[in-house]
Each structure stands twice: as structure tokens, then as C-alpha cells.
């Protein structure tokens, strides 16, 4: 959600910073602990607002789900990746008698990469991650160029 919105802003040439609050999936929606974001928000944002940002880049900030006094500091991190394993489809009938389908992703234990945002959050830090919009996988360019080099036309 927040990173998607920041991507749209960056594509439009707007300085883009995504602010996200981490929270436990259990009891989701009951109470989200915004203490860390409230106490640390200005400290995190000031340097980001004062610095120059390269075109087509954005910043992703994640606040841990802990009390503000327990935050250990701020880490500049790499982007981490969750492995959600296999999805499942849950079928049900709504109160009006219509069928519905939920597609669920089941989080599995993760081992966050070193210097990743996931590691920082797990360790009690606020993560600040610079992201870029050029998603080109440079290492594959030569391989793909070689695979298509012999083709001269559509025929």
C-alpha cells in the first residue's frame, strides 16, 4: 500500500517517502502500536526532506511494533523479501447466500538477509530503505541478447 503510493509519486516526479507501521498479524486491526512512529517520525523525516533524491527513487521507512522507548535507533537498510510459501483458496458463503473466495498467503518463518529492512525491524530498529524504479535485471541482459541475436525478423 504505502510503497505502491510512493512508487506512483516517484513516477510522477514527486519526492516520495513511504511510511509503514509494522504490526502483529494476530489480532490485526484490534490495536496497532503507533508509539514508535509518533515519537520518531520527525527525527526520521527531517534528513529525508533535507536531502536531494535522485529521479525515480523513493524511500521506504518501516517503524517496528514496539514502544518508542524500546526503539534502538535507525538503520539504513537493503530491501528484504518475505517468503509466503504456497497460497490457499478458502471458499465460503456470505450472509446473503453468495459464494466468495479468499486467496490466502501463509507466512513462513523467515530468515532476514543481513542489512535488510526485515532484520532491522526484527532487531528493534526503524528501517530506512532507498528504492529505485529501474527494475531491469542487468545480469540477464547479455544472456537474453545472446538468445535473440540470431533472430533478424519475425519470419
What name fits each language-model region?
Residues 1-4:
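Charged helix-capping and loop-helix junction motifs
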Residues 32-155:
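Electrostatically charged, flexible surface regions
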